[in-house]
Amino acid sequence: MKNAGPSQRQLRVGEQVRHAVAYKLQQGILLDDLLKNIVISVAEVRMSPDLKIATCFVSSLSTLHNVSPTDVVNVLNKHSRFIRREISYSLRQMKYMPELRFRLDTSFDNFSKIDSLLRSPEVARDLHHNDEFKD
């Protein structure tokens, strides 16, 4: 049963860390100039089996067109120790405060690609062709 997916504890702790990180980022604790006018969304947090590493998948909505999501992730990784300390106050029940690693969340991009493929004329034609055989 190796690689059976994350345990229930990993999922529960990951959700607690996600809430804490999202709340602190919403408060605007980082005073970096690059993060002004940027909304950061924490989509998911995956915990390592020993609960010592938390990989946070984030996406950003920028009102400035010259800020790339990769730059936002780099800034978050630069300030990860500060964010870790800030969330430690709300996660006191944890024996070890996990190391935070920020990664770009590409799930929305993947969804957009799949959606555009499903809406393509070739797929629509095939779906319409399959409906004729059902009758």
Curated annotation (Swiss-Prot):
The record's annotation in Pfam families points to:
RBFA
Which intervals of the chain form a coiled coil? none
Q: Which domain of life is it from?
A: Bacteria
Q: List the disulfide bonds.
A: none
Q: Name one GO molecular function term.
A: ribosomal small subunit binding
The signal peptide, as residue positions, is none
One GO term under biological process is: maturation of SSU-rRNA
Where does the protein end up? Cytoplasm
Alphabetized UniProt keyword annotations: Cytoplasm, Ribosome biogenesis
Q: Which GO terms describe its cellular component?
A: cytosol
* Subunit relationships: Monomer. Binds 30S ribosomal subunits, but not 50S ribosomal subunits or 70S ribosomes.
Function (record text): One of several proteins that assist in the late maturation steps of the functional core of the 30S ribosomal subunit. Associates with free 30S ribosomal subunits (but not with 30S subunits that are part of 70S ribosomes or polysomes). Required for efficient processing of 16S rRNA. May interact with the 5'-terminal helix region of 16S rRNA.
Stored NCBIfam families? PRK00521.2-5, rbfA
Family according to the record: Belongs to the RbfA family.
Q: Which HAMAP family match?
A: RbfA
Tell me what this protein is called: Ribosome-binding factor A
Species of the source: Bartonella quintana (strain Toulouse)
